[in-house]
Amino acid sequence: AMGSEMALARLGVATCMIFSPFFARLGGQVSVSRSVAFGVVLMCIALIMTIVYFFMDQKLDSQTGEAEEKDDPFKISDLGKILTDAGFWIVALLCVLYYSAIFPFQKYAVNMLQCNLTLTAPDANSFWAQPDVTIVQYVIMLIVAAAGFASNFQKKANLKYGLLGLSIVALVTYCYMGYMRQSAESIFAVFPLLAVLITPILGSYLDHHGKAASMLVLGSVLLIACHLTFAFVLPMFKGNAVGGIIIAYTTILVLGASFSLVPASLWPSVPKLVDAKVIGSAYALIFWIQNIGLWLFPLLIGKVLDATNPNVTDPTQFDYTAPLVMLASLGVAALILGFVLKVVDKKKGIGLELPNITE
């Protein structure tokens, strides 16, 4: 269930990635305010849905009688049980390290691609230069998401693999359109799509086979490999219009796989670390710690980028090697914590490697 929820969340990320540049350029004059307005509209819709959910939850509590159950109420002192748990702190720190290597990177990724890829704008009169192509790409993106998402819930093998095949074909088509548009933002927008496709699959695997801690380790390894590829391999292909984009797409898709592995295994592990009545508090503390990293590391990336490019005035000529190595080092720290978590899990019998569903 959590894997499916996160897959839909990744679709939201992809929507913002593909439509933000579209709205910014709408009308022929670039204006960030239109993209911001688009985000505000989405937030208003989310607020309405949250209010509806609140009342639905209240109604459910009144029907089941859970609202009146106070046998074991929450106490502030219960937070001490969370803060003194070694497993919780390992997961919280792993979370802040991993997400700090992902979300701040998204802020700079498009410019990084512009600096390392040889992109030639299509002719102004060609199909690929028209704003309507964005709509076509988004429809294909929805096909990737819908077919891949639906394939996870099919019991018939033919239908399951047919939908999966359709999703993969649509994904390849989307990548081809990004190449033809010669647009860095269109190329990077593929990042969340593989996560939409495989996160429910990983969630199902976690439910039936376990291995959450191992998935955290694997996700960290992929993260390190991707950032180092962006830092050292991609610049080697600058001037190679096809080779550079192939390397970029491959690395972005692998990073998307990492972005599926870690969240799909990290968030369902929290209930195994803390008491049921403090799960909400545990998640809140983790998000609080995570947001510290999401505030700090974009600033650090900017400082490092400025320090390593002192005389560069053209934004398409920045050298991103140092910031990418810094992000890879966060992945190394997350990897170490992943191995520590496996040791703690084995020592304390937390059950992170065990399946959620036992028959």
What are the residue ranges of the model-derived segments?
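Glycine-rich segments within core transmembrane alpha-helices of 12-TM secondary carriers
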Residues: A1-A24, F287-P298
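Extracytoplasmic gate region of multi-pass secondary transporters
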Residues: A86-G148, A170-A195, P263, F297-P298
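A late C-terminal transmembrane helix in Major Facilitator Superfamily
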Residues: A276-P310
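Helix-to-loop junctions at the C-terminal end of transmembrane segments
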Residues: G148-K155, I198-K211, L305
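Interfacial helix-cap and linker-helix signal at transmembrane-aqueous boundaries
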Residues: F19-G28, L113-Q114, Y205-D207, I301-P310
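C-terminal transmembrane helical hairpin of 12-TM major facilitator-type secondary transporters
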Residues: L163-G178, S183, A189-L194, A212-L266
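Flexible cytoplasmic inter-helical loops of multi-pass small-molecule transporters
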Residues: F38, F54-D78, K348-T358
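Symmetry-related core transmembrane helices of the 12-TM Major Facilitator Superfamily/SLC fold
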Residues: R34-Y53, T321-V340
